[in-house]
Amino acid sequence: MSTVTITDLARENVRNLTPYQSARRLGGNGDVWLNANEYPTAVEFQLTQQTLNRYPECQPKVVIENYAQYAGVKPEQVLVSRGADEGIELLIRAFCEPGKDAILYCPPTYGMYSVSAETIGVECRTVPTLDNWQLDLQGISDKLDGVKVVYVCSPNNPTGQLINPQDFRTLLELTRGKAIVVADEAYIEFCPQASLAGWLAEYPHLAILRTLSKAFALAGLRCGFTLANEEVINLLMKVIAPYPLSTPVADIAAQALSPQGIVAMRERVAQIIAEREYLIAALQEIPCVEQVFDSETNYILARFKASSAVFKSLWDQGIILRDQNKQPSLSGCLRITVGTREESQRVIDALRAEQV
């Protein structure tokens, strides 16, 4: 008699799945955490909603209205979810038939697009970016048959650069009537002029992912948004959980999106950008650093001599960076979150001490 294990009962694609290696999952025992693109200090909030015996609204009205006003869209073009990661998954669940349809993304980029698709049983197609990390439009065009959702991160994580807006327009024309194009704007607060939110009227198949985890300094809240036309939002509403946001999360999100919350966010952004420029200038003078890439975000990608040794050396000193060596075209690269001046100085001093 054959014994069937619990693992044997699991779906084959789940058995074969490599889970996303989040910064927290990778661990480390540090006191300088520069591996998850978080804001370096906590912002304080007071809970005002105490009725925790009642279920929350599925889409909290104040949160939706505040975010719509902030993003310059209509409330019916906004969906709030448990982080932008849930938005990534909802789009696949709403638009992709497992075993039939595919998603497409352009590495090196954020790892959750593939993990979400693989979990659901949807094929992943990749078209690596060009040498300048811009879209390979011909390559995308050649692979579009059967693709229902295309993910483009701009500014891109982990490289830090914006995608050329004309290339976005070409992609949106290529996919019209065929696929949803998802612009992942998790870091758009650091370069707000580049948002595609104003394009929604022109492109019914455009969706935009946003988050409160970065510039709003609320990574622990798990609150994200999808901006899209009402037809797309209505489809996502069919597959989202009935109560995606807890009452305390909605309460804090509404406060963060108040006029004074937006002002505070913009002050944080200005501070991070100033610190980013300081850190870039310092990195460019350090012998073990081969190249520092331009960034429109709250992190810096740099190529190092002996990057694995540098990564481990800093790790052992309690400075936790993000190793990007395994990503296509990123050999020797580490990603450094922009933190406080004190944290920047710890990184600079540690790197200066590295023997080349």
UniProtKB/Swiss-Prot annotation:
Q: Which domain of life is it from?
A: Bacteria
Which InterPro entries does UniProt cross-reference here? Aminotrans_II_pyridoxalP_BS (IPR001917), Aminotransferase_I/II_large (IPR004839), HisP_aminotrans (IPR005861), PyrdxlP-dep_Trfase (IPR015424), PyrdxlP-dep_Trfase_major (IPR015421), PyrdxlP-dep_Trfase_small (IPR015422)
- Write down the top EC class of this protein: transferase
Cited Gene3D superfamilies: Aspartate Aminotransferase, domain 1, Type I PLP-dependent aspartate aminotransferase-like (Major domain)
User: Known EC number(s)?
Assistant: 2.6.1.9
Write out the pathway annotation from the protein's UniProt entry.
Amino-acid biosynthesis; L-histidine biosynthesis; L-histidine from 5-phospho-alpha-D-ribose 1-diphosphate: step 7/9
- Among its keywords, does the record have Transferase? yes
Q: Which Gene Ontology molecular-function terms are recorded? A: histidinol-phosphate transaminase activity; pyridoxal phosphate binding
> Which UniProt keywords are listed?
Amino-acid biosynthesis, Aminotransferase, Histidine biosynthesis, Pyridoxal phosphate, Transferase
Which cofactors, by name?
Answer: pyridoxal 5'-phosphate
Q: Does the keyword Protein biosynthesis apply?
A: no
Where in this protein does the record say N6-(pyridoxal phosphate)lysine is found?
214
Per the record, what are the reactions this protein catalyses?
L-histidinol phosphate + 2-oxoglutarate = 3-(imidazol-4-yl)-2-oxopropyl phosphate + L-glutamate
Q: Which Pfam families match?
A: Aminotran_1_2
Any single biological process term in GO? L-histidine biosynthetic process
Q: How does it assemble?
A: Homodimer.
Q: Which family, according to UniProt?
A: Belongs to the class-II pyridoxal-phosphate-dependent aminotransferase family. Histidinol-phosphate aminotransferase subfamily.
What is the name of the protein in this document?
Answer: Histidinol-phosphate aminotransferase
